[in-house]
Amino acid sequence: MIETELQHKEIMPFFCKPEESGGLGYCETEPNIVSDDLFIPSQLAEFVKTADPQVWKSLLSNHHGSEQELALALKDTIKKGILESSNVAVWLNTHKTITFEGETVPLYFVSGTELGGDADFKKNIFAAVEEMKHRIVCDGVTLQNLRPDISFFLNGIFIGYMELKSVTNGQTAKVQGRGKIIGDYLESVKGMAERAKAHPAALDDRRETLWMFEKGIHLTTTDVNETYVIRSIGGFYDDAVKGFADNTVSITQLKPDMEKVFKIYPITSELLSNKQRFVEVMHALYSKKMIEREILYYNFLQYKYKDEGKGSKKHKVRVSHRGTLISPRPKQKFGCDRILGRVREMLEHEKEPDFYRERLKKELKALGVTGEKLEGILADRDRYCNNKYVYSLLLQYAAGFGKSNIIGWTALQLKDLRHEGEWAFDKVMIVVDRLQLRDQIDTMMMSMNIDKSMFTEVTNQDEFIAALTGLKRIIVVNIQKFLELQNALDKSDKTLKRMRVAFLIDEIHRSNTGDSNKEMINLFEKLQDGINGAVAQGGGKVYKKNLIVGFTATPTEKVLARFGEFKSASIIPTWVPFDAYTMQEAIDDGYILNPTKHIIPVVSKINFGVPADYDPGAEDQTITIDKTKIYGNSDRMEQISHFIVNRLVSLVYGKIHGTGKAMLAVTSIPFAIDYCNRIRKMMGERCKEPLYARYANAPVSIVYSDNQEYESSASMNGGDSEAKVSQDFKNAKNGLMIVVD
């Protein structure tokens, strides 16, 4: 099917089909009613007139009874606001109503209100426009004439556009689709740069000239099989306009870097047909409720803050006036949306304790798994009461995924989620370990204009119990205090059984003790066992099911079997995370470096005696050595410490213009402390040599989560807090940071 047929016969009918029939419920709008500055004044007027007839009537008296004149005046006011904002979503989030000529004028209605539900939300006008003509004008000169395949509007306000490509024509979204959008943007920037050579003030027109590219929520391109998304395309403006101005870059040279962030939108299964893929992704990007999420959650300005005051008077003060636009990459939004989608499903079947067991049973039978094998797999899940008394989701996200944003976006949406006419979750609890992540989440809440009265951080059991019964909806708790949560659960048993609480746990399992006979501390299991036990003792009656969402980069097989999803693509009983962003994906996307490319082997000889039960005459004997005996071997630690010190002073510290630094990841707290003491001693001795004296002040720092069995992290760093140690390491020219992984 050629591109025009695809657009007219498939794409537009899907967008404009009623939602109850599987479409998106958009209003098909003729392109000739779109204004030159990307508004549909008649739809803006229609929305306001329907939303508040009395206000509209009152405003008409100021405009000689002319609806057209009033609509244009209102449009110009809205335009001014959006021009001064990062994008339309950020502006609408804080301007659902505006004061215009002394009246409060509604511009957008949210869904799920306590009194009206979705009644007002349905009054919003979502419009799709084919082949809208738009002139890119700078300093009064037309740079380009563009006709995006489909443009989108909300209550008459432009929110983005899409370019279509047809594989039948030998074109794809990946190549020609991305190339069209990027090329159009760069041609416009190049035209501005050329114009500015004679008229420097031309660059002052950037906001209006590039409105179509920079003010929408996102720009997309699809060939039905694949859909690509780019946000914040304006981030490339400075380099592009400078390069074009001094003739040091070309459009061809700039395109590759832009294509790196113009990413494909994920799908739930590779087995989906082309049409199923398209429908799924369009619902994710353009359904009315998803556009609402873009406005309410997924776009916000992040500011810099500093702490002021001490103790109970400690608070954050904003120190930057210009914020940085934060919005999700396709995979991040996909992950958040999947979590919310599964949570809604869980709520719908909350009163069916065997719902997920029966579904798993059907999946297994469909794959031909029967008899003892079927019962064995089901027995494994039954043994853990998985999703019976408490729901759980396991998410495997590697470094570079932006986990703090994922946790923040998820927490805020769970806080606002409604079920059966009330809040779905009475509380949302964020359990974190890293001081940096706690600070990031706190800053994120403030940047998203979340009232401080809506979230709090608790430090002990009494505060935790008080928070459960208080008005604050989001609770941030330190991981060490959370380890004592079982006692608090016992004390607040009746309260929890009548509440629905969502727990978001960062790094659900950790290995900090180093004890050879202990498995890693698993917060997921501890919490679930506590709730399962309490419910079982109470006769198995559940008032509301709690939710546990666990984040980890490296789930063990046991954790996967207990909390993962059955991989139905194979009859082998394997379990996978509910959603994943692996280290390989992070490497491929360029967010982290590939550590396997620069492995430096270190020879470390260790002598172990023959086990007492070793039989010289037996064949195929397996001799195993406890890994803690290897990691904790004193001779091995001495050799490694010596190698590290030599490598730091002779090579690492001299790199990156003399500002090289390093990090050492150790398996447990006691081993980390031992390494720290050894390395500090050796470093002190080496820095007495004239050649390395300049490194004498390079810090050797250590950071770990305090455990009562060992000396505190602060005591290992001269009494400095984790925050100060991290900041000093960041500011230092050279240094080594030892962490517990």
Which residue stretches match the model-derived regions?
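ATP-dependent helicase/translocase motor core
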Residues: 1-18, 31-401, 405-427, 436, ...
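Inter-Walker segment of RecA-like/P-loop motor cores
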Residues: 446-487
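Conserved C-terminal RecA-like helicase domain
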Residues: 473, 628-739
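Interdomain helical connector at the RecA1-RecA2 junction of SF1/SF2 helicase-like NTPases
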Residues: 560-659, 676-677, 681
